[in-house]
């Protein structure tokens, strides 16, 4: 397909039943995994439809990786019971303590 101009390429793709569309205005794409997130900023996103199946091609402008702290409901309930606080307060204390139960409880019961 060397030397094929864009118009010929579009015509060939249409004959093969392939549709392509560039998504405009995409600010970021977030990939969530256990324990971390990858944020793709200002990506070029193309959607290709072949035989009814969609495929997304993402080319990021920049990338950021963030660690994600996962706090279980059981941990939140334990802090609530031990420190005598509500759900939101217990969750916030655990987040600030990076999931450390003892540190969260001590912080809430001291002072």
Swiss-Prot record:
Pfam families: NAC (PF01849), UBA_HYPK (PF19026). The keyword S-adenosyl-L-methionine does not apply. Keywords: Protein transport, RNA-binding, Transport. CDD domains: UBA_AeNAC. Residues 3-72 form the NAC-A/B domain. SUPFAM superfamilies: UBA-like (SSF46934). GO terms for molecular function: RNA binding. Contacts the emerging nascent chain on the ribosome. Homodimer. Interacts with the ribosome. Binds ribosomal RNA. Belongs to the NAC-alpha family. This is Nascent polypeptide-associated complex protein. It comes from Thermococcus kodakarensis (strain ATCC BAA-918 / JCM 12380 / KOD1) (Pyrococcus kodakaraensis (strain KOD1)).
């Amino acid at each position: 397909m060397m030397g094929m101009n864009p118009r010929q390429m579009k015509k060939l793709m249409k004959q093969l039943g392939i549709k392509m569309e560039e998504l405009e205005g995409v600010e970021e794409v977030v990939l969530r995994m256990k324990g971390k997130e990858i944020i793709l900023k200002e990506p070029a996103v193309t959607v290709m439809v072949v035989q009814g199946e969609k495929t997304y091609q993402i080319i990021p402008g920049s990338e950021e990786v963030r660690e994600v702290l996962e706090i279980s409901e059981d941990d939140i309930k334990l802090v609530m019971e031990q420190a005598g606080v509500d759900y939101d307060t217990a969750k916030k204390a655990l987040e600030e303590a990076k999931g450390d139960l003892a540190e969260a409880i001590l912080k809430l019961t001291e002072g």
